[in-house]
Structure formats: structure tokens, C-alpha cells
Amino acid sequence: MTDQFDKTEKQYIELTSGIQRFEHFSVYTDPFLPQIFSHNFVQLHRTFPLDKLLPFFSSVPGMLQANYIHVKAAPEHAFPLLLKQNLVKQGCVVEDELFFARKLENRDLQAGHPLTAWGTEKSLADGSSIMNIYDALYIGEAAAEQKLERKYPLYKDGTVMLVVCYSDASQTIPIGCGELFINKADKTAKIEEVAILDQFQRKGYGSILMNELMAAAKLNGMETVYLVTSGMDGVNRFYEKLGFKRFRRVHTIFHYFLT
């Protein structure tokens, strides 16, 4: 990992996950949140031979100490069609993580939108609350509470900024939030965990929240901001409208075992 995005991504992941490095891959695990897949995975190095991938899978659950396989290919890896077909036949889900980035020279990025807040006790409480509510809908209440307990110290000490979006300027009802992680050395920020409650989506709140996240990054001296998303066309078009451009595609493989 040599460029600014790799460095920032590594720093962000290691806030919650420990790492074991091997010759052709690294293992990231979070013993406090083994059920959160983004905290637990095997990252292949570019030197990993793809013809060894299928036999390698049998050892992954043991490495992760989990009942699932979660493997991320190196950016340099391009899976042949036959490999993808064989993975699917074995019950694996093969998806792409897409990396988007944009520069922050835009003079229109001004922090302080009346529907957003960050850096205060109230915004910390509101952001934590809405993050917990959103996560509970998708990963369950118990996992959501454990995740918040794990990440709350990072929010409280400012290691990760929590930007909140409200339904109106009274800032009474929080409806969404997003994380901002800053890599000061490389002047690069990562936007993560962007969430707007379903009933408030497609009403402009997502753009307001994203613009505030970018403005906050710019205010903190960042020159570039990036995020990682899935291959969903609608989501990708949303980020492209905000000035982001895709610069990387990474294959991910997942297989969950019921027993």
C-alpha cells in the first residue's frame, strides 16, 4: 500500500481491526465485533496467485474465527469469468467494491448548513442515536448496540467525526449521519457509514449531508475525499452527481455458513 488512498484506508480499518500479515495476504479481525463483516476479512496481496484461491477458502473461517468467508482481492486482481462461475457454484457471493474520489477545491463547499451539525455534544448524541437506529434496522438491535459501543470512543475523541443531518433547521429530529475520517499527513479524508432513514431518502437530505461532510473535510485542511461503495448503479450516479469519479474496483467474495 503506497498511495494516499491505501494509507488512509489502512488507517481507518485498523481503528477497529487488528492485522496479521502473511506473505501473500493479511488477516483483519475485530474480536469485539466478529459479526460485523467490514471489520473481519482476508485481504489478498497482489502477489496472491488466483489459481490457489478456491483451495485457500477452507482456511479462511479459521483465520477469521468465524462461520463465514470474507475475502477481498487486491486492486490488481481481475477475476476470469470461469473463476467467478466456480465461486458462485460453491455458494459464494462475488461483488465489487468501488472506490470514488474527488478534489475539494470547489469554492461552493461551505460548512455550516442549517440542517447539519458536527463537533458538539448534541450532535454527538444525535448522531450516535440515529446511527444506532439505522444499524438496528439492518443488522439487528444487539449488533447495532455493540457496534456503537465499539465506535463511540472514536466519535467522542474526534478520531472519527460524526456529521448529523436533521429534518429541519430546528435540529430537533436527526434523520441521518455520516462518518469522516481524516488522514492529515496525506490530506485525504474518507467518508463512511453515510445513512439517511428510508422515509427521508430521495428528498435532498443525502446531498446536504454529503456536501457538509466534504465541507468539513475541506475546513480541516483536506485536499481530497474518497468513499467506498457497492456496484449499485443508482448509488454510483448519486456520487457522480456530487463530483466523485471512480478510480478503483476491488472484487470481494463472501460465503456465510449456517452451521
Predicted regions located by residue number:
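Short amphipathic alpha-helix that is part of the acyltransferase structural core
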Residues: 1-9, 44, 98-99, 106-147, ...
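N-terminal charged segments
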Residues: 1-64, 79-80, 84
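A short helix-loop-beta-strand connector motif used in the catalytic cores of GNAT acetyltransferases and
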Residues: 13-20, 65-67, 78-79, 95-96, ...
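Conserved beta-strand-loop-alpha-helix junction that forms the acyl-donor binding cleft
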Residues: 72-79, 226-236, 252-259
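Conserved active-site alpha-helix within GNAT-family acetyltransferase domains
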Residues: 78-93, 207, 231-249
